Amino acid sequence: MSTEKINLDIHKILTLLPHRYPILLVDRVLELEPHKGIKALKNVSINEPYFQGHFPKRPVMPGVLILEALAQAAALLTFSEEQPKDPENTLYYFVGIDGARFKRPVEPGDQLILNVTFERYIRGIWKFKAVAEVDGKVAAEAELMCTVKTTDVAP
């Protein structure tokens, strides 16, 4: 990433994201450069609840959850720059996914590295280039579009 490296542990992540078990999919932020990009980590454990059914004899992390992990990293990048005015009632939503490609399976024991680069912000929509890697090889990639919405009911 580059010059200013910001590292966020799980405690800080929990203050920035509303997600909790079993859908919190970022364990640590390794690097964060405001207005540029983020490099985060998801340790993929056999204890993940989705492995019971996807697939019992050859567990593979569902592709949609890899995309969700990338979106959570994008949310951390966004919220690290711009703290929500009302965090209890603020949610981060997907509004689009373009060019999603899955290149290799993600299996128990893998460390999924989530690389998200800011591309642009127009009319309330953030656009990111997102790449998930395992052992330096691309597992999935996509362009993500996300927005922040305030709800009227606390989670």
From Swiss-Prot:
Q: Does the record bear DNA-binding in its keywords? A: no
Question: What is the name listed in the Swiss-Prot or TrEMBL entry for this protein?
Answer: 3-hydroxyacyl-[acyl-carrier-protein] dehydratase FabZ
An example Pfam family from this entry, by short name, is FabA
Q: What is the lineage of its organism?
A: Bacteria, Pseudomonadati, Pseudomonadota, Betaproteobacteria, Burkholderiales
The active site is formed by 54
Q: Which family does it belong to?
A: Belongs to the thioester dehydratase family. FabZ subfamily.
Q: Which UniProt keywords apply?
A: Cytoplasm, Lipid A biosynthesis, Lipid biosynthesis, Lipid metabolism, Lyase
Where in or outside the cell?
Answer: Cytoplasm
Q: Name one GO biological process term.
A: lipid A biosynthetic process
- Origin organism of this chain? Burkholderia lata (strain ATCC 17760 / DSM 23089 / LMG 22485 / NCIMB 9086 / R18194 / 383)
Q: Which InterPro entries match?
A: FabA_FabZ, FabZ, HotDog_dom_sf
NCBIfam families from the entry? fabZ, PRK00006.1
The gene is fabZ
User: Per its record, what are the GO molecular function terms?
Assistant: (3R)-hydroxyacyl-[acyl-carrier-protein] dehydratase activity
User: Which reaction equation describes what this protein catalyses?
Assistant: a (3R)-hydroxyacyl-[ACP] = a (2E)-enoyl-[ACP] + H2O
Q: Report the EC code(s) recorded for this entry.
A: 4.2.1.59
Any Gene Ontology CC annotation: cytoplasm
Its primary localisation, in coarse terms, equals: cytoplasm
- Functional description taken from the UniProt entry: Involved in unsaturated fatty acids biosynthesis. Catalyzes the dehydration of short chain beta-hydroxyacyl-ACPs and long chain saturated and unsaturated beta-hydroxyacyl-ACPs.
